[in-house]
Amino acid sequence: MIFFSDYPDIASNNFMDFSDHILSFYKQLDIHSGLPAGVEVLIPYQQDQAVSLCGQFYKKYYSDKNKRFLILGINPGRHGGGITGIPFTDPLKLEKYCGIPNTFAKKSELSADFIYSMIDAYGGPEKFYNQFYISAVSPLGFTKDGKNLNYYDVKELQEVLKNFIIDSLRKQLEFGIETTVCFCLGEGKNFKYLNRLNDELKIFNAIVSLPHPRFIMQYRRKQIQHFVDVYLEKFESAINSK
């Protein structure tokens, strides 16, 4: 079994590859500010199985020093990344597409269904993860009354999280992130917030929005192939203009 204690703290070793940086980042990931009443944080990186699965996944696909484009979702949900610790990767996709067995209940998450359809069309996990790194504006997820909560759903939560979001983003840039463009999942509030943050921090040359996978699966399911093509076209454009 792989433990986060096996990995050094961020930036402590110039010989760290992309996977080492990711796993060291997860090792220290926590929220120290007080959350609004009733809001609970999802921290899968404190669970032994999630820690082991993250180690297997990131060592399989990120054991190099290649630069990658960053894709930012909103925050993990309780049925996907909130369980496995891997963004948009539920236990079923982790086993079926990535070949990493696990004992979690094999439930599908809608967003993961779309993401892995797109990854499959791109050429498979190995090719996709060699060029892209998926995270979220808030790399930790939230629930309230047992339901998923977005960081922007509660104004007080968004305000409390700002320093955590900025600190997390800056740490992830050290992994080897390409800053010419960042892809944002969501064309509404997530895109607006990320643009405002980028105007303040001046990190990326451009933020490119993509329809959120959950929106596609809930409201445009019959057009999945169209949206897969939209993703692939925007990714190809970014790679070709690099």
Set out the residue ranges of the language-model regions:
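A polyanion-binding, active-site-adjacent surface
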Residues: 3-4, 14-181, 191-196, 201, ...
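Short, charged, surface-exposed secondary-structure boundary motifs
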Residues: 212-223
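Short hydrophobic/aromatic-enriched beta-strand-loop microsegments
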Residues: 202-211
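Catalytic core of Fe(II)/2-oxoglutarate
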Residues: 188
